[in-house]
């Protein structure tokens, strides 16, 4: 059964400044959810909390499989992943960078090779699999981050500003990758972006972050 996510009354403050103010929403359908809003509206914070990278000050973050609540343990964390803008790179090949998530999960060599090659093909980087990742452009690095996430075949994928600071050509490529993922039903995807036009192009469900709350558009 596919994962569902319910957040209820989520609050978060930094140094006494509220960022999230009683956020509640159910991410229960497949497709692409897009969180929009101005810089500092809490989009990235909400993604980190949903991806279990940070904990809320108050409120609940609950994952379901069917009607069953799932423990927030390592098994759940292996079913979700967050891609940040400007991913960290290792001084090794594109292939090894894309394989990182699988390797730390103990993936077998042949299965890892198959999944990584498929992910690199999907994002258009298979021809650079043996290149050093440090030679990639910023747009290619962002695509590599998506490939690294895709290789582990997450059931829920979080993308934080996936086209921030990349050129128009790579922005179009990344958007097409997301649309193709949606077409194939690969993951339930939750994206944070300040670009309203991009939100309209990608989203099945558009959500506005305003004063630390989620408003369905």
Question: Where does each model-flagged region fall?
Answer:
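Catalytic Walker B motif of ABC-type/P-loop ATPase nucleotide-binding domains
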Residues: 157-160
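Conserved ABC ATPase "signature" region
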Residues: 110-128
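Conserved ABC ATPase signature
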Residues: 132-136, 140
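H-loop/switch region of ABC-family ATPase nucleotide-binding domains
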Residues: 193-194
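The feature captures the beta-strand-to-loop junction immediately N-terminal to the Walker
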Residues: 36-38
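Helix-to-loop junction immediately C-terminal to a conserved catalytic motif
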Residues: 51
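ABC ATPase NBD coupling module
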Residues: 67-81
